[in-house]
Structures are given as C-alpha cells and as structure tokens.
C-alpha cells in the first residue's frame, strides 16, 4: 500500500479528518448549548 506520493495523500487524509472532527464537534457543542443541562 506504499506509494511514492504518500505524503500528499497523508496530508489530505489529515485535512479531511480534522474537518470532519471539527464539524462533528461544532454540531455537538451547538446542540449541547441549545438544551442547557436537561439531564443533570
């Protein structure tokens, strides 16, 4: 699975992973702030 252009692919994978994590985290925080401690 090793390719000569693996560095670019690795950076691309990191970018996608960070973007996905950021989007999921933003949605979670937004939903959490919308309902303030419903089940505490």
Swiss-Prot record:
May interact with the viral DNA. It is found in: Virion membrane. Keywords: Capsid inner membrane protein, Membrane, Transmembrane, Transmembrane helix, Virion. Its main location: virion. The chain crosses the membrane at residues 10-29. GO terms for cellular component: membrane; viral inner membrane; virion membrane. The gene is IV. It is a single-pass membrane protein. This is Protein P4. Coiled coil: none annotated.
């Amino acid at each position: 699975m090793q390719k000569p252009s693996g560095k670019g692919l690795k950076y691309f994978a990191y970018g996608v992973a960070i973007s996905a994590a950021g989007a999921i985290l933003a949605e979670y925080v937004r939903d959490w702030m919308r309902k303030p401690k419903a089940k505490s």
